[in-house]
Curated annotation (Swiss-Prot):
SUPFAM superfamilies: D-ribose-5-phosphate isomerase (RpiA), lid domain (SSF75445), NagB/RpiA/CoA transferase-like (SSF100950). Pfam families: Rib_5-P_isom_A. The gene is rpiA. Belongs to the ribose 5-phosphate isomerase family. Keywords: Isomerase. This is Ribose-5-phosphate isomerase A. InterPro entries: NagB/RpiA_transferase-like, Ribose5P_isomerase_typA_subgr, Ribose5P_isomerase_type_A. Substrate binds at residues 33-36, 88-91, 101-104, 128. Homodimer.
């Protein structure tokens, strides 16, 4: 796939639209955060106009605003603690269906929603598929304990930085009122072990490593011409 912006957008659109076609009438679905998911929302809007009945649980204020704009009815995990499926993007995905997520700073709600779903549909363009996870792992932290968390995160072999906002001074604030620490790892030999190690640090709310949902994950990889659907052996089609 050509690396142009138009080609990437076409790949994301193809993946998002294919995910939306997997939604069945009467489903309660999780709606992730990010540009690829917004294409799924766009497609769902058209299907709703054609008579599809569906309600969504958004993972961020941004997604909630987009869903309302496109006429998708919304609900909450309080009212629907079990979801039929969830659709979300990823920054990286490896052959074992382990993910790094979190550029949209919604990792805690995304992980809650994905964990509540019978099936987790991950939509990516082919550049997001990697042989091994590495690079930046976002971590959501309590502001009160961020400095102490930084020291312990360094002990796990990374270079952590508090994410700075782009259009305002100061750090990025999540929808939960917390900070995002971006942790740069040169390599991640054992993603599941690292996810557990990060989670054990006091003050950490959640990390962008998703390693415990591989059994119910389907990855839709988009490119300009077609989509590839990768299904975990543990998923029942």
């Amino acid at each position: 796939m050509a690396g142009t912006a138009d080609a990437v957008a076409a790949a994301k659109r193809a993946a998002g639209y294919q995910a939306a076609e997997m939604v069945e009438d009467g489903m309660v679905i999780g709606l992730g955060t990010g540009s690829t998911v917004f294409y799924a929302i766009e497609c769902l809007s058209g299907r709703i106009r054609d008579g599809l009945s569906v309600v969504g649980v958004p993972t961020s204020y941004q997604t909630a605003m987009k869903a309302r704009e496109y006429g998708i009815p919304l609900t909450t995990l309080d009212d629907n603690p079990v979801l039929d499926l969830a659709i979300d993007g990823a920054d990286q995905a490896d052959p074992q269906f382990r993910l790094i997520k979190g550029r949209g700073a919604a990792i805690t709600r995304e992980k809650c929603v994905a964990s509540a779903a019978f099936r987790f549909i991950v939509v990516v363009d082919e550049a997001k598929m990697v042989k091994k996870l590495a690079g930046v792992v976002p971590v959501e932290t309590l502001p009160f304990a961020t400095k102490t968390a930084l020291a312990q995160l360094r002990g796990l072999g990374c270079r952590p930085f508090i994410r700075e906002a782009v259009k305002k001074d100061g750090p990025v604030i999540t929808d939960n009122g917390n900070f995002i620490v971006d942790c740069q790892f040169e390599e991640i030999p054992d993603p599941a072990l690292l996810e557990a190690g990060i989670a054990a640090i006091p003050g950490v709310i959640e990390s962008g490593l998703f390693t415990r949902l591989t059994g119910n994950t389907t990855i839709i990889v988009g490119n300009e011409k077609k989509c590839s659907v990768l299904t975990s052996p543990d998923v029942v089609p």
